[in-house]
Amino acid sequence: YWQFSEKIYSRDLQGIFDPDLGYLRKKIESSLDYSGEKSLDLIFYYSGEGTTYRGEKVLLPYDADLKNQYSFFPLKKLYSNLIEIQKMEEVGEITLFMDVDFNNSAFQQYIVKPGELVEDPKAKKKKKKKKKKGELETPVVTLPKEIMPPESITAFYASNITQITYDHPDMNNGIFTYYLLRGLRGDADNGDKNITVAELHDYISKNVQDTTKKLYKDLPQVPQLFSSNPDRVLFRLP
């Protein structure tokens, strides 16, 4: 377990995830030496801002500057670095928890309300159900390819790329993070003491959507999950 809680600059992200000489690789090696274990799984939690820069999704370090393309940290670079690290025989599963808002107000935004989504004209039209009076529009969920990780990486994202990621009104973190922590403490468990990827996502997704619909009505937040093995056990409760 280790954390970075101060301002993260572009050089920090470069130094952390460099697959050959980076902090992460060194930390893996030292952790295994200390624990005596032969392998470990990696779990990353990141809370911060993102945007679209030159057509791709990027993380915004503290020193991000539109005039300097190297001050951004592309998601595809994060993924490629993690794939290289995963080639280490000591590294098993990699799981990301990304409480990231890709619509930072300082950059171009791509916020879309559910009612503004354009249907694919080639898609088969389904008969719409009549909404009850006062019933909120159900957001259309499509997994955004722009943030899709390689198949061997499981990634939980706080929202879709066309949505705002909200802070919790009463806590010092995001609504996604709040329910992530509650889920890991046991609220996501179905009673067998094993919290799977799917259980955790279902719990987070339901509660984040319910909370943001109440608070923000037509601009809800819908968490996203990318996983090739949703039944994998993430955490075992005592």
Predicted stretch roles:
Residues D187-P238:
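Caspase-like cysteine protease fold
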Residues Y53-R54, P149-E151, I175, N229-P230:
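Short, solvent-exposed loop/turn segments at the edges of secondary structure
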Residues Y1-I8:
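Signal peptide-proximal N-terminal region
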Residues S10-D18, D63-S71, I164-D170, A188-G191:
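Second-shell loop/turn segments in exported
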Residues I94-M171, T177:
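Extracellular S/T/G-rich loop segment that most often corresponds to the catalytic His/Ser-adjacent loop
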Residues P19-S47, T51-I111, K193, E199:
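Caspase-like (clan CD) cysteine peptidase catalytic core
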Residues Q3, E29-G36, I83-E90, R185-D189, ...:
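Sec-exported extracytoplasmic/periplasmic mature domains
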